[in-house]
A protein has these predicted regions:
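Extracytoplasmic beta-strand/coil segments of soluble accessory domains associated
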Residues: 72, 76-117, 121
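Short acidic/polar hinge/loop motifs at secondary-structure boundaries
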Residues: 117-146, 163
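Short strand-turn segments of transmembrane beta-barrel domains in outer membranes
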Residues: 148-149, 160, 164-196, 207, ...
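Transmembrane beta-barrel wall of Gram-negative outer-membrane proteins
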Residues: 182-211, 216-255, 279-297, 338, ...
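Face-selective signature of the C-terminal outer-membrane beta-barrel domain
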Residues: 238-244, 282-430, 437-438, 453-455, ...
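Membrane-embedded beta-barrel scaffold of Gram-negative outer-membrane proteins
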Residues: 295, 301-319, 455, 461-467, ...
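Gram-negative outer-membrane beta-barrel transporters
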Residues: 344-346, 351, 364, 407, ...
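C-terminal beta-signal and adjacent terminal beta-strands/loops
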Residues: 566, 616-625, 644-696
Length: 696
């Protein structure tokens, strides 16, 4: 028996496939463009990030010491970032990060970049950070709120995550690294990297492979990914070519049903089981990027890069055994995106004031095709063809208006052209609806930013900003938009029509840097119109009544001695409906309170280093529970430990995650018809991982 309605079950399937069928990472860009804009307001003072915005940086050293096994969990140590995982384990597949409380649609409202190039695509699939070789990451920059929309465009609503990768430029002539590991659920993984450097030429390669049986039945994962580049670097000119690719196969175990009305609780009786033993999701991605940087005059650089990326996805959903034909569905989709992003960086005085300008043009051309059939071998019921072209121009400038005060402003205008069509075959097995109406649409949107920072002294800084952003509907949301049936259950054609989501936010806070102590805290508020969400009553995607986010985020660190570093953070996140039938209710899948703490203790001259982290999150509403009538996903906490060390060129680590074996789940989807009935995706208890390797 299904735990939720068929449409809601399809909603859960879509989320599962969207989270795991995600974009392979794009190629690194030039070193000059690989950070969020750097503003040099005097010769002796520089800071990173967008002026007035809340920005956090996770370094390569932080990543190396983190007990967490996935990049998503490492990022979730940043206040204001939540993580939702469908499958747990120690590989990170099926996990998504959420900046500032967007729940099930977090991936569409968090923009992910690789070296300043956007990865978010035309479909609902989020960026699968587990496909990025961990050793290839130099740092991760997180900017929260709307301000990133000026430089990077749509999806930058909750914030921007910029992953900066390593290169071989400036390094030793030859450098190599190998690592192998094994752990819980028969996990086996290995990685290799190499970098060559000779005069102006350099190259690098990072590759990783992983296999695991997974925590649950039908939850095995097999994944391979690699990235390589060649660079030429001279004083006034540099160029690069990068090729990357990944391949993943993942079993989809589905949810565990709980229904007190019939005495059913699979979380207790069969937590690791599956009701969907045949469901799967596969993904293959190939990406090529090339570009150059040319110094035009002192302080001015022309940066031009472009690329093409291909993503193929296949997923099959067959339901429980014995398989029933009405439960069967198969999807085979392909997406190709071409991009060209020339920009100009100018760092010169303007009317005697230090000035930093970044201006440019972004062009993206994406083509999507998806065959939707009952089985892989049968004729497609629907063939969806969508193409989307965006052309944008932007300008952002930061001025040192006083010796201790910086002001920034910027704007972006973006034209989006969409062409969407559906070919429906009524004779195909499983056909029961009708063909969607075609849609051709042109739309212009804009984003704005204004920010201010003032340094009272070397210790205390205040900052504030206001911004606006937008998010265009993606292809999966358009396919599932509008009613499929009328009141008499007669099929009606879809329209692909959804309104563009818009938002406006403000933020203010302070930073402290006093010797070994550092802290940052901010308050923010965000109002959204036409937020795109799934309606659990009408069973299709729609634009919501106006919604709101507000809260606070605080982080701090203290080095109490050379070997010991303490760190921690706390965030209060409110995501609520501000109008309509659900006014005052929480947006599902958003915890109001999250907190973390950690310690790094160098016990013995890097031969033995102890790292420990604790992460807490409060209860949250289940997906589908906008009406706030169902049980909450319970609050919980996990403790992770890691012992690591290095001697000469050899290194090792032992990690224990979820030390106290907490039994929890991040995601559940509620029934809209039966009180107390839901499907949950249980996560693993205590897990282990042992790794060892060497450098050459």
């Amino acid at each position: 028996m299904s735990s939720v309605s068929p449409a809601a079950r399809r909603r859960a399937r879509l989320l599962a496939s969207s989270v795991v069928l995600s974009l392979a990472f794009a190629a690194p860009a030039l070193a000059q463009s690989s950070t969020l804009p750097t503003v040099n307001v005097t010769a002796s003072r520089a800071f990173n990030g967008i002026t007035g915005a809340s920005t956090s940086v996770i370094t390569a050293d932080d990543i190396a010491h983190a007990p967490a096994q996935s990049i998503q969990e490492i990022i979730a140590q940043t206040p204001g970032v939540q993580v939702t995982s469908l499958y747990g384990g120690v590989h990170g597949a099926g996990s998504m990060i959420d900046l500032r409380g967007f729940g099930a649609f977090a991936t569409a409202n968090t923009l992910v970049l690789i070296n300043g190039r956007r990865l978010n695509d035309l479909d609902l699939a989020g960026v699968d950070l587990s496909s990025i070789p961990r050793e290839s990451i130099e740092r991760i920059e997180i900017t929260k709120g709307n301000s990133g929309a000026v430089l990077y465009g749509d999806n930058a609503v909750g914030g921007v995550v910029n992953i900066v990768t390593k290169t071989g430029a400036g390094g030793p002539p030859v450098k190599m690294r190998v690592e192998a590991g094994g752990g819980s659920f028969n996990q086996q993984q290995g990685s290799v990297s190499a970098a060559l450097n000779s005069g102006p030429w350099s190259s690098s390669f990072y590759g990783t492979a992983l296999k695991s049986d997974g925590y649950r039945d039908n939850n095995a994962v097999s994944q391979r990914s690699a990235i390589g580049d060649i660079r030429y670097t001279a004083p006034d000119f540099s160029a690069f070519v990068t090729l990357s690719g990944d391949d993943q196969r993942l079993g989809l175990p589905g949810g565990r049903t709980v229904d007190p009305s019939i005495g059913l609780n699979q979380l207790l009786t069969d937590r690791r089981g599956t009701s969907t033993p045949l469901d799967f999701a596969d993904r293959q991605g190939v990406n090529v990027t090339a570009g150059f940087t040319r110094t035009l005059w002192d302080g001015a650089e022309l940066i031009v890069d472009g690329g093409v990326r291909n993503k193929d996805q296949q997923s099959g959903f067959f339901g429980s055994l014995p398989v029933q034909s009405f439960n069967e569905s198969y999807m085979d989709s392909s997406l190709q995106t071409w991009s060209l992003t020339p920009r100009l960086s100018i760092r010169n005085a303007l009317f005697g004031l230090p000035s930093d300008v970044l201006t440019g043009i972004d062009y993206y051309d994406a083509a999507y095709r998806s065959n939707r059939s009952q089985l892989q071998t049968t004729t497609p019921v629907h063939v969806y063809d969508l193409s989307q072209r965006t052309l944008a121009a932007y300008w952002q400038q930061t001025l040192g208006i006083l010796p201790d005060t910086d002001f920034s402003y910027g704007g972006r205008i973006q034209r989006t052209s969409l062409d969407a069509r559906d070919r429906f075959d009524i004779t195909a097995p499983g056909a029961f609806d009708v063909q969607a109406n075609p849609l051709r649409q042109d739309e212009t949107q804009h984003a704005l930013h204004v920010g201010l920072e003032h340094r009272f002294n070397e210790v205390f800084t205040v900052f504030g900003r206001a911004a606006s952003a937008f998010r265009t509907p993606n292809v999966d949301e358009r396919v599932a938009s509008g009613p499929s049936f009328d009141a008499s259950f007669n099929a009606v054609p879809g329209t692909f029509a959804l309104k563009t989501q818009t938002s406006r936010d403000i933020e203010a806070g302070f930073r402290i840097k006093a010797g070994a102590f550092a802290a940052q805290s901010s308050l923010y508020g965000m109002d959204l119109d036409n937020e795109i969400h799934y309606n659990p009553v009408l069973f299709y995607n729609t634009n919501l009544d106006p919604t709101r986010r507000y809260g606070s985020e605080t982080s701090a660190s203290l080095r109490i001695s050379e070997p010991v570093l303490l760190r921690g953070g706390v965030a209060v996140t409110r995501a609520v409906f501000r109008e309509g039938a659900f006014a005052g209710n929480d947006i599902p899948l958003v915890s109001r309170l999250t907190a973390n703490a950690g310690v790094t203790w160098n016990l013995w001259q890097n031969f033995v280093v102890l790292d420990a982290t604790v992460r807490y999150w409060s209860s949250r509403r289940m997906d589908n529970d906008q009406a706030a009538t169902q049980p909450l996903i319970p609050a919980n906490a996990t403790v992770d430990l890691k012992l690591s060390g290095a001697w000469d060129r050899f290194f090792w680590s032992l990690s224990v995650n979820n030390l106290f074996d907490a039994m929890y789940y991040d995601y559940a989807i509620a029934s809209t018809a039966t009180l107390g009935r839901f499907n949950a995706y249980p996560l693993s208890g205590r897990t282990y991982m042992v790794k060892a390797g060497a450098t050459f």
